[in-house]
C-alpha cells in the first residue's frame, strides 16, 4: 500500500541533497537573466543541466513520464512534461494534466483545521475525545493529530485495507470505516512521545472539520482554499468518484498493495523481471482514492499545486501569528538527531522547502516552496514507486533541487 510513511524517507533524501541551501546566508547561484532577444522558449541553465539527468532517472525507475514545474524568479521559471500518458505509449504528457496528489492533501486538511482554530471553533490543545468519544485516550490533542505524534495506528498499513484494495479497487470507503480500523489496534506510543506517520490522524481531523462546520470537508476546502487561490482544477472528490478530470495520464503500480505493506521494493526476482520487461506495472488509475480521503484523495495540476504550495509556505491562507506557529512547529521527527526529517502542524520541511510529498497507487508527487529564496518546485510521475521501491518524483525533485541550489554557498 502506498500513501504510507514515504514522507519520512523522502525528507531524509532531500535534506541530504540540499543541505547547503538550508541556511539563509546560502543564496541561489545567480546568473544573468536572458537577454530580451533570447528565444521565447529558451530554458534556464539549471533546467538544461537537469534535463538529461531526469531522462536517465525515468529510465532507471521505469516511470512512463513526469511533470516538472518550477517558479524561480531569480533563475528563471521552468515547466516541462517528459514522456507519455500511458506505459510505453505515444500520447505525450502535458504540464496541465491532472494528477492525484496523495498526501499533499494532508496540508489542505491541516490548513482548514488551523483556520478553524483562528476562528475560535476549536483549540490545538483540545482533546480529540471532546469531538470523538471513540478516541479513548483523552491525552491525544488536535495538535498531536496534525503533527503525527498521536501514536494512533495507521489504518493503511493493515492487511484488511490492503487486501480490500487489491480485491475491490473500486470500493468507496467511508471515513468512519477507516477510523474504526485505526482505532481497533493498540496505540504505538503515548501521545507526544514520538513521531509516527498515520493516515488515521488526518481522517479524524477531516471528520472533526465536518462536525464543527456542518459541511462536507470538500466544500470547506473549496471555500477556504481553492476559491481563495482561484484553483479551478483542484478538488477533493466525493468518496464515490474514482474518476480523474481530463486531461490526465494513466497511473501505474508495480506489485500489489499487500506485497508492499512492509516494503515498497519488489522481490529481487520481480525487480529483475520488471527491468527485463517481462513484469509490467498494472493500471491503478481508477482505484477509488476514498481510502485516503482527507489524508490523500485530492486532485490538482502542477501549476495549481505550485500556486497552492507558495500560499501554504508564505502564510497566505492563515493569519501571521498562526502561520508563524505552524512553521515553528516543524521539528525533527527524532529530536536527538536534528538531521532527520521534519514535520509539524500538517506540513513538512523538505530541505529548504516547506511542503509535502504524496504517494498512492499510480502516482507520486513532490510539492515544496522555499520562502527565503522564493522558489517553488512541483514534480509528479504517473508511477508510484520503482521496482526497487524508489519514489520516481522524489528522485527527480532531488535532481532539480541539486541544480537549483548548485553553488549555493558561494
Regions found by a protein language model. Give the residues of each.
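Bacterial N-terminal signal peptides that target proteins for export
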Residues: 2-14
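Bacterial N-terminal signal peptides
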Residues: 11-23
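Bacterial signal peptide processing site
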Residues: 27-29
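Short, conserved catalytic-motif segment at the N-terminal edge
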Residues: 44-99, 121-123
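Short active-site loop at a secondary-structure junction
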Residues: 61-65, 88-145, 189-198, 293, ...
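Short, Gly/Ser/Thr-enriched beta-strand-loop segments that form substrate-interacting elements
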Residues: 83, 334-371, 378-381, 387
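Short, surface-exposed loop or secondary-structure junction motifs
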Residues: 139-353
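Short, gly/Ser/Thr-rich active-site loops of penicillin-recognizing serine hydrolases
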Residues: 331, 340, 386-410
Amino acid at each position: 500500500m502506498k500513501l504510507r510513511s514515504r514522507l519520512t524517507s523522502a525528507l531524509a533524501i532531500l535534506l541530504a541533497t540540499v543541505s547547503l541551501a538550508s541556511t539563509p546566508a546560502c543564496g541561489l547561484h545567480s546568473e544573468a537573466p536572458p537577454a530580451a532577444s533570447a528565444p521565447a522558449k529558451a530554458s534556464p541553465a539549471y533546467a538544461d543541466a537537469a534535463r538529461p539527468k531526469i531522462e536517465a532517472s525515468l529510465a532507471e525507475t521505469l516511470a512512463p513520464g513526469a511533470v516538472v514545474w518550477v517558479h524561480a524568479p531569480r533563475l528563471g521559471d521552468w515547466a516541462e512534461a517528459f514522456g507519455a500518458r500511458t506505459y510505453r505509449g505515444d500520447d505525450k504528457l502535458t504540464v496541465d494534466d491532472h494528477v492525484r496528489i496523495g498526501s499533499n492533501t494532508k496540508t489542505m486538511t491541516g490548513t482548514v483545521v488551523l483556520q478553524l482554530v483562528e476562528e475560535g471553533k476549536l483549540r490545538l490543545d483540545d482533546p480529540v475525545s471532546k469531538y470523538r468519544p471513540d478516541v479513548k485516550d483523552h491525552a491525544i490533542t488536535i495538535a498531536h493529530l496534525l503533527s503525527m505524534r498521536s501514536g494512533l495506528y495507521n489504518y493503511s498499513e493493515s492487511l484488511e485495507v490492503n487486501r480490500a484494495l487489491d480485491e475491490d479497487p473500486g470500493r468507496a470507503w467511508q471515513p468512519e470505516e477507516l477510523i474504526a480500523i485505526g482505532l481497533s489496534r493498540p496505540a504505538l506510543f503515548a501521545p507526544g512521545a514520538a513521531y509516527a506517520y498515520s493516515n488515521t490522524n488526518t481522517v479524524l481531523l477531516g471528520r472533526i472539520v465536518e462536525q464543527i462546520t456542518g459541511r462536507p470537508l470538500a466544500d470547506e476546502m473549496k471555500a477556504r482554499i481553492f476559491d481563495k487561490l482561484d484553483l479551478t482544477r483542484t478538488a477533493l472528490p466525493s468518496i464515490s468518484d474514482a474518476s480523474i478530470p481530463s486531461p490526465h495520464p494513466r497511473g501505474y503500480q508495480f506489485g500489489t498493495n499487500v506485497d508492499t505493506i512492509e516494503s515498497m521494493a519488489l522481490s529481487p526476482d520481480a525487480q529483475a523481471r520488471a527491468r527485463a520487461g517481462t513484469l509490467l506495472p498494472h493500471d491503478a488509475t481508477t482505484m477509488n482514492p476514498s481510502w485516503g480521503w482527507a489524508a490523500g484523495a485530492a486532485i490538482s495540476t502542477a501549476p495549481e499545486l505550485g500556486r497552492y504550495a507558495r500560499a501554504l509556505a508564505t502564510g497566505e491562507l492563515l493569519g501571521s501569528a498562526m502561520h508563524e506557529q505552524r512553521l515553528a512547529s516543524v521539528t525533527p521527527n527524532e529530536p536527538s538527531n536534528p538531521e532527520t526529517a521534519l514535520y509539524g502542524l500538517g506540513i513538512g520541511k523538505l530541505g529548504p522547502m516547506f511542503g509535502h510529498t504524496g504517494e498512492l497507487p499510480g502516482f507520486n508527487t513532490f510539492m515544496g516552496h522555499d520562502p527565503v529564496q522564493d522558489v517553488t518546485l512541483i514534480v509528479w510521475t504517473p508511477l508510484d514507486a520503482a521496482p526497487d521501491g524508489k519514489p520516481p518524483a522524489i528522485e527527480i525533485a532531488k535532481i532539480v533541487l541539486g541544480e537549483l541550489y548548485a553553488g549555493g554557498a558561494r
